[in-house]
């Protein structure tokens, strides 16, 4: 079998901010909504194995369709803010959208489904249009069976089951009227048979479980309580005894086809201190020829805890068995919870999208486990470190995140993980650039640039997790005077360095004295050094992996928009948003003194992206004014830094682009640069004289060297691979506004009229691409795949890696086989 041209190596993402967005299947796979996609995540391999793209709005609800025999599921239901419900089915090992249920007039917030037969599904969906719709699905077709209207009320969750001893479906709905409504299908239509009262605030979750011929219904509410109800069939011979001294719970009775069913309140569980958003029964398991349901109930709350409840064996009284949760940070609590098929792992997803996983170890203790993480808003920019061993990303979720491959001892498995969150800011992040291996500059929706440098604790942990030699890292980076870590003051935005002395200072209690000042009781530093052998948990990422801020750079009048640094890491260029020429200047900064070197003025509107040439002699800038400018470094005097002067530029009359130019990049040999624009055009520029690096010929004019490539959609990102293909052509990646990534090969030709200089190599398929704008594309600066250094070097020479960042909150890394192009 031929090697694939493009393979997805890593997907970084997190769960959407919705209560019903995560579902753990009997096959061990976790499905969750991330922006407009449904991610299929394997917790054993710790990686996303598939992304299902069909929704055009945020995915709010995901639910596996469980098989009666507890076998791995082949069907999945999702609902989104595009008002649609989609039925996914696994065919030939891949999930595909088999039916789109359209009919709601508002976002879908909850879904559930039950198998009526091997080929028929009953699907329920709740929406903010104040209705619950019932759908039937069979043979790749779905139709609306019934719409249940709730007037001005909203149903927050729905759950379907089959009545004991029958194939009659029963529907539970929990909503903002603080009640749980039960509907049963009678004569083909669902009719309300009972309303269960007791909750004193919105009901956030409902779920059925089937045990020993009885149905158990759990409901959770914003009143911080959980109620467990029991539904059973009443037998005709059952006596109605009124025994003195015995308290009997009230029975709510309804009839279906002449048979009586009763619902009683089994227990009320109080233990959470904030709204309870999610509940989940432990999945049933197969024991011999029968299916057994355990009465263990998991709950998740905004108080940052999950509780596992269950009845005591002796008394039958429901008690709290396990409580786990998140400590520290300024985050809100949990939105939902799930349990693995065998009950050995429990999962929560938090307000900011983070997944929290605990496993039951051999000592019967619950321990945190490694899980994927990602941005919970648009990813705006990213950069590889100069050695290609990690990437740093920034996003509109106000965080900067660092990802690296995790190399396990004695295992060939390599997965990428977030190992540091250098910056947690108060403004949406916009741009960054690396300045050396362990230093970067970032810009946000503020006028200030901030410079960060890695602490000693990060360098040590990076070496342990990535399998890199610590001695090698120490050799390239003088860490003798580096701080241990960083922490953020309670009311501050700047990460303050924490040194060894700050950690070692004894507390007053240790000296036997009393507190003598407020500073003893309320310390500025919350940092604790970590010695990591595996990627950190969300708690540690929030609190113990910050990088100290070493400098602030002032000079811009508006919010930052783009950054670039030269290959020698001596100069940083920055630009901000601008609607006038006076603000559309490029500021150059010295990385030695962090002083402003120069201001370069040419453009009249926002500069959207900049790139230094690989030899560091030229600076390219593209702008919203539809033009580009090229600046050349002069020869430095003995006492002054080299100054940049305008070398070439296009005007509105000479520019080939007719809309905003979004992106630009250089070829590794300095001979060409590329621009991409909203007008769907990608153009390569250089000297008409073949083989001359841009800027070397005094009389040579910079002109377009390629035919105009029309990519069919707004080209929002472009990047040239630093390595040539086997036929000595240049490899380019182009990111589009619709989320697709295209690979092209380009070869300089004398005759451009035939457009044969471009050849299309590969397009991302429906699962590989993004679902929203591609914001940034970056090639790894070295051949090979990150973390595969120990493999046969000749084999690795055939591979390059491409990282992409999208407005769909996702960061992806692709393995691209140069020999297969």
From Swiss-Prot:
PROSITE patterns: WD_REPEATS_2 (PS50082), WD_REPEATS_REGION (PS50294)
UniProt keyword annotation of Ribosomal protein present: no
Pathway assigned in UniProt: tRNA modification; 5-methoxycarbonylmethyl-2-thiouridine-tRNA biosynthesis
Stored CDD domains: WD40
Sequence similarity: Belongs to the WD repeat ELP2 family.
Notes concerning its domains: Folds into a two seven-bladed beta-propeller structure which is required for elongator complex assembly.
Self-association and partners: Component of the elongator complex.
Name the UniProt record assigns to this protein: Elongator complex protein 2
Species the sequence originates in: Danio rerio (Zebrafish)
